[in-house]
């Protein structure tokens, strides 16, 4: 596993999240299947993130706290994604959790781009 698998899982997860968001609230089989696939991607994202941290993040001095912070932010992003889908499915307001998802996703991505592992844009 590696950085590319982690990023690919995130990209697929976010794309399928928006597909599931568009389908949520409709009581059809397709919406449930997409939501389950997104949940599977959550597990893959968490597993690859932990693997990246254990394999390389722990060995880079001076960045331990930032990697742990990024893991916490990543889990919060996944939590907001799931809360958004469940609230939409139940017909409740999703504005707050959707804004939370967007804010935490942006912060997590920016922190990830700042850290030594992965792509170096900054």
From Swiss-Prot:
This protein's name: UPF0344 protein BPUM_1008
Organism: Bacillus pumilus (strain SAFR-032)
Pfam families linked: DUF1516 (PF07457)
Transmembrane helix recorded as keyword: yes
Transmembrane segments: 5-25, 33-53, 60-80, 93-113
Keyword Transferase carried by entry: no
Family as reported in the entry's similarity comment: Belongs to the UPF0344 family.
Coiled coil (residue ranges): none
Compartment list: Cell membrane
GO cellular component terms, semicolon-separated: plasma membrane
């Amino acid at each position: 596993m590696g950085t590319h698998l982690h990023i690919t899982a995130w990209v697929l997860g976010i794309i399928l999240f928006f597909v599931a968001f568009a389908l949520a609230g409709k009581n059809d089989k397709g919406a449930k299947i997409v939501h389950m696939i997104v949940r599977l991607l959550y597990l893959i994202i968490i597993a690859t993130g932990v693997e990246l941290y254990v394999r390389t993040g722990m060995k880079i001095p001076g960045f331990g706290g930032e990697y742990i912070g990024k893991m916490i932010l990543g889990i919060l992003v996944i939590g907001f994604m799931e809360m958004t889908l469940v609230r939409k499915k139940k017909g409740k307001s999703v504005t707050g959790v959707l804004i939370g998802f967007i804010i935490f996703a942006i912060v997590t991505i920016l922190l990830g781009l700042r850290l030594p592992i992965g792509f170096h844009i900054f």
